[in-house]
Amino acid sequence: MSRFSSLLALVMVAVLAGCGRPEFSDAEKQTIASLALSRLPPLKPDTTNRFADVPAAAALGSTLFFDTGMSGGGTVSCSTCHKIDRQFQDDLPQAVGVGRTNRRTMPLAGVAHDPWFFWDGRRDSLWAQALTPLENPLEQAGNRAAFTHYIKARFGERYERIFGPLPDLSGVPANASPLGTDAERAAWNAMPGAQAEEVNRVFANIGKAIAAFERSIAPPQTRFDRFALDLAAGAEPKGDAAFSSEEILGLKLFIGKANCVTCHNGPRFTDVSFHNTVVPPV
């Protein structure tokens, strides 16, 4: 064999050796383990909602979540945008309810672990978040007086078993809200204060029931989680848990030089904080 051929053979051996399956350092393994869903802590008690972990409240909340009657026109429900087979989002660039909004639908899987809600964090409790789309004219386009009447007519017994007696609604307008149309606001402003407070209480309880249901929506295990569990156990990942060399290199970048893990960390791949990424709004 010529000297050139020998040198070429050595180069090829070195190249092939470099193309082997990448390995993780102990530090990388620790970081990967911290991202596994198995590290997700138990839900903290919701001190703003004493019905948060009441099964009957969650069951009523589930019914309301999927009920198109919980909208002004009877055509849209929470599940219109939060689809059960898409981690409770809809894959659209902008949510479409009664109209088209200017924001993407947020996934609800694991949402109860968040300290604040909406893309801009404008709600600090899950039940307050659940109420907002109900009266948004582009989402469900309803109003709290109409929802209160609807609850009494359709779910009165279930509601009262959980939250206690419903108020007398005989003098409550069919449509009224402090956030609605001009006519709805006028009707709301004409209501006695005590009557408005009773409607607000029922409306708040609607949100608390929906929030109780949403607390039950856990993020599903993914093939990454299975990979991380096998890696932590020292086992060779099998089946869909087996990552390709390209996926492993991508993961090494994610937790290493690319610094993705700086913000996308923890079992839900988020630090639940706000960051200015200098990306213009859609």
Say what each PLM segment does.
Residues 6-15:
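Bacterial N-terminal signal peptides
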Residues 2-5, 18-282:
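Periplasmic c-type cytochrome electron-transfer domains
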